[in-house]
């Protein structure tokens, strides 16, 4: 990879990562499938299952860039959430919506954080191959469609405003106040759904949005909670593996990492901006169709090669 990955390839991969990390289509699944389908040196250089692949160091930079884009987009929310978190520690109780939302994110992050430390490398090396990724992408399609079916069943509950004067509130703070009404145990369940995204082909944002719909959230609030939950996990995953970026695996690819990270940041920012508006009025169905087509076509292509 050091000698072969061009800046154009780095930018293309970075942009692709930034979009697929937040769209409910699985960035890891695409990171496995696209090089295999393209073939040639991409299949050799861009391998996530190889134990010592330099591509793993490259991905670290992209994860940090994606998390940075989420932090920039939601910076006002994170200022309030962090203030609420430290306020709750100082007063030793949860009193406000911001404090409650902070702890919902904390309890929702712990399960996937522990599972990631224990299982990420095992899943990546054993299942990070084209056929399992395509199969899980099909399963992701089923999950997204099932989420829409469940949403219709609980729609009367989800449409009731959780905050008494919610109709007088507008924008992000109103959504955060609605999210703060979730019981902590539901926050744990929605956050724990991210564990499934360790499987290549299962989307982190998709599975948490589905879990949110299942627990009665609207599409808008489920997507917002999904992106807030994803931020600390994506950032922690990147920071945890930064030594790989500056170690032997990252030798000679600093320029490519920077170029790819810039592309990833820009595309992730545009993606989250688009999706937060998209889910105000629309559903997961188009993404379910895409995953079904992409997963099925990939399986057929791989079988015929």
UniProtKB/Swiss-Prot annotation:
Membrane association type: Multi-pass membrane protein
EC identifiers of the protein: 3.6.1.27
GO terms for biological process, alphabetical: cell wall organization; peptidoglycan biosynthetic process; regulation of cell shape; response to antibiotic
Residues passing through the membrane, by range: 18-38, 55-75, 103-123, 130-150, 187-207, 225-245, 246-266, 284-304
GO cellular component, one term: plasma membrane
UniProt cross-references to PANTHER family, sorted A to Z: UNDECAPRENYL-DIPHOSPHATASE
Role of this protein: Catalyzes the dephosphorylation of undecaprenyl diphosphate (UPP). Confers resistance to bacitracin.
Additional record remark: Bacitracin is thought to be involved in the inhibition of peptidoglycan synthesis by sequestering undecaprenyl diphosphate, thereby reducing the pool of lipid carrier available.
Protein name: Undecaprenyl-diphosphatase
Record organism: Mycobacterium avium (strain 104)
